Amino acid sequence: MHRVPNPSYPTTRHLLRSLACAAASVLLSTAAMADTWPNKPIKVIVNFPAGGAADQIARAVTQPLQAALGQPVVVENRGGAGGNIGGEAVAKSPADGYTLLMSSGGMVSVNPHLYPKMPFDPVKDLTPVAAAARVLVFLEVRPSLPVNTIQEFLAHLKANPGKLSFGTPGNGSSPHLAAEMLKTQANVFAVHVPYRGAAPAMQDLLGGQLDFMFDPGIGLSHVKAGKLRLLAVGSAKRSPLFPDVPTLDEVGLKGFDADTWFGFYAPAGTPPDVVTRLNREINKVLGTQAVKDRITALGGVPAPMSPTDFNARASIDSARFGALIKARNIQGD
């Protein structure tokens, strides 16, 4: 018996045609977005308070970036929870290229190890856009501390277990991890005082409420003014700003490297053409002398690279710092 097709049910061919049209529509709309982007102001959320390294780098880059993109680029600070508050805000924003995150690389390489119940997955919910800078960490002490060299400082720490305190921008922050590296490799103990950002910690170091700090670069002007004493660099190489200051590796803490990477991220699903344009323009800005000078003044080195290379850097740090966090039983805020 011949069955007459029911016109109310689409055939397989019709379904495939509809799906193809839908896919083409998505591709066309994405391409159209990339062609017209940006046509309104762009917001960059910094997930640490104003005055810190992330904030200063963001402002150094976004100021000239405005001219390159032809739209205002507005910086907004949303600190707290180790950067997770600002990170979540960006991860849950529309993936249209108009909301970006400026963060240390710890957002994707450290926080997943610190916060097992994060409200978002930074690896899956954020896409790397561009690295901005590699910032060295500087071991600084209050001038009244009775030490003048890194060797004297380490001896003083060993002779006074638990009597010295150090400040950090928060539990699991890069300066905190640097201090935990120091405690592990030098076999010393000091009291950790976490803050909401590097700037308030620096103020208490200047005020004498803290004994030492791994500074991500915001206190170098105080070092030059004699208000803080710089003893060592917690990086693989000496700083060009202070070529006479040794690295911790040089004084016996072999392999010590706690550099902090900063960069820009976008919500996952942001059109690839938009990410490519942002990466290209940010890398151009990083090559200008004015931005180089501002990043160098922070104790950093401009780090232009592709999103793929930036992501690979985060993977390396994730393995390295993840092991430290587990060994030291470090907990997030």
Walk through the language-model features, giving the residues of each:
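C-terminal lobe and pocket-closing loops
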Residues: 219-287, 319
